[in-house]
UniProtKB/Swiss-Prot annotation:
It comes from the Bacteria. The lineage of its organism: Bacteria, Pseudomonadati, Pseudomonadota, Gammaproteobacteria, Vibrionales. Belongs to the universal ribosomal protein uL22 family. GO terms for molecular function: rRNA binding; structural constituent of ribosome. GO terms for biological process: translation. InterPro entries: Ribosomal_uL22, Ribosomal_uL22_bac/chlpt-type, Ribosomal_uL22_bac/org-type, Ribosomal_uL22_CS, Ribosomal_uL22_sf. This is Large ribosomal subunit protein uL22. GO terms for cellular component: cytosolic large ribosomal subunit. CDD domains: Ribosomal_L22. Part of the 50S ribosomal subunit.
Amino acid sequence: MEAIAKHNFARISPQKARLVADLIRGKSVDQALEILTFSNKKAAVLVKKVLESAIANAEHNEGADIDDLNVAKIFVDEGPTMKRIMPRAKGRADRILKRSSHITVVVADR
């Protein structure tokens, strides 16, 4: 049985979020939560909330035992990019890309 949780339009670059996602892929949920708790990356906070939501979904919807769950799948897709302008010298302007992500976590029995 699987339980899914998503965070769409998370305000973090997909490249940075994938670094954290790679740390917990395939791990047990206890181990994954421990890794995310002590990680000092901004993405770790967002991924941890999604993982906790997936665990709660598994427990509530499927009646799963938390001790038997592991991170079956985790992936970070690219969301829409907000384009912003930064004024520069001599009337020029640079574009700033504020990237967003769609974080998906799937937990399943071992």
